[in-house]
Amino acid sequence: MIVKTKEEVVGTPREIFAPNGHWISRRYLLAGEGMGFSFHETIILAGTKTHIHYQNHLEAVFCVQGRGEVELIPSGERFLIEEGVMYALDKHDEHYLSASEEMRLICVFNPPLQGNEVHDEKGVYPLKKGQ
């Protein structure tokens, strides 16, 4: 059984800060735990808009706090994200994630992240060796 507390993640290499300052990702489960997915708590900072395109991963997201929106590219279709809303990027959907107020999101990735991935210039988490 795997049990991790917030105190075991915050301030360690499992807490990743976006280079652009838009988000903080606390990675509780990673590929090395062998679960077949990774599990994260992600904080999206208020007033930010982030381009994301997970070409190599599927992601499901559940909002537990805050408010924002997902805007699909290129259609421009928008979805309100607030407490109690789940969205799943089941088609590797390219999108913008905007936060009108700070959001706290619970995220699951498949394949699992290895640990320190950040979005590249195209909004992608590159695959690492073994994925």
Curated annotation (Swiss-Prot):
Pathway: Amine and polyamine biosynthesis; ectoine biosynthesis; L-ectoine from L-aspartate 4-semialdehyde: step 3/3. It is an enzyme of class 4 (lyase). Keywords: Lyase. It catalyses: (2S)-4-acetamido-2-aminobutanoate = L-ectoine + H2O. Pfam families: Ectoine_synth. The keyword Methyltransferase does not apply. GO terms for biological process: ectoine biosynthetic process. InterPro entries: Ectoine_synth (IPR010462), RmlC-like_jellyroll (IPR014710), RmlC_Cupin_sf (IPR011051). One of its GO terms (molecular function) is ectoine synthase activity. Catalyzes the circularization of gamma-N-acetyl-alpha,gamma-diaminobutyric acid (ADABA) to ectoine (1,4,5,6-tetrahydro-2-methyl-4-pyrimidine carboxylic acid), which is an excellent osmoprotectant. Belongs to the ectoine synthase family. This is L-ectoine synthase. It comes from Wolinella succinogenes (strain ATCC 29543 / DSM 1740 / CCUG 13145 / JCM 31913 / LMG 7466 / NCTC 11488 / FDC 602W). The gene is ectC.
